[in-house]
């Protein structure tokens, strides 16, 4: 069950921009877009991004240092994310696969490493490329 979060004004503005972008956005691109809506300081953007990541509304694509809207509501409660990233067009797709989650959970149990979250990124070429 997805937990409902009350977003602040800044969080809502930033989430809407990321969600409508259709792909990953870097923090300074977000700042450029939100300045027209009254958010002027980078710190305001970073605080909102941190909170949106924390509650699972967006994800950070570590290899691109960019943010993307969550495409799968179940990861908002599991803290487990995986992405396929096209090396040519840079299209990013969120992977929601219960078998992958189960495998990583078993791996964690067998290795003795208890993870608090994971963010996997797989690279290759998409069907279009």
Q: Can you say where each PLM-predicted feature lies in the sequence?
A:
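A short, conserved structural fragment
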Residues: 53-61
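Short, hydrophobic-biased segments on the C-terminal half of alpha helices
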Residues: 46-50
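Short acidic, hydrophobic short linear motifs in intrinsically disordered regions
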Residues: 24-34
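Short amphipathic alpha-helical elements of helix-turn-helix/winged-helix folds
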Residues: 13-21, 33, 55
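Short, basic interhelical loop/turn and adjoining N-cap
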Residues: 36-40
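Short alpha-helical segments that sit at the start of domains
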Residues: 1-16
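Non-DNA-binding regulatory cores of transcription-related proteins
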Residues: 60, 64, 68-129
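Key DNA-contact positions within bacterial/archaeal DNA-binding proteins
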Residues: 43
